[in-house]
Amino acid sequence: MNYEEEAHYLLDSNIVSEIIKPEPDFNVISKIAEHNSDCAICAPVWQEILYGLYRLSEGMNKKYLDKFINDDVHENFKIKNFTEKAAAIQADLRAKLEKTGAPTQKEDSMIAAIALANHMVLVTRNTKHFTAIQEVSELKIENWFGDSGRS
């Protein structure tokens, strides 16, 4: 990936996890291939991926996944950090959501804030996790699985 260019799509962990599966969803793989140079992940997603890896028992599968995650995922997708700008956006989102009574996971609001701070489209299968955030912000979401999203 050319790190001089800004990515347009921020991939959620469920999208990245799909790449790792032995039989990944065709639509997801096609979209990633089509937009590869326009895709990035963020630090909270990277943490979720590594956490999943570190929880695995030692063995061939863990060694394979470790190599794939560090050699392919890490090398192909720029990692967007949780910056001061994203922190301010997240604080605003959480305050707005609290006023509406809409619950949201702290990690989801961090991911959304990073997408908003970088003017990116969040790509996730879990669109329902971000519905309340969309209602109080200009967050754009795409579901590359093509289904209606999961809760």
Regions found by a protein language model. Give the residues of each.
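Short, well-structured N-terminal submotif of metal-dependent ribonuclease cores
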Residues: 1-42, 54-69, 150
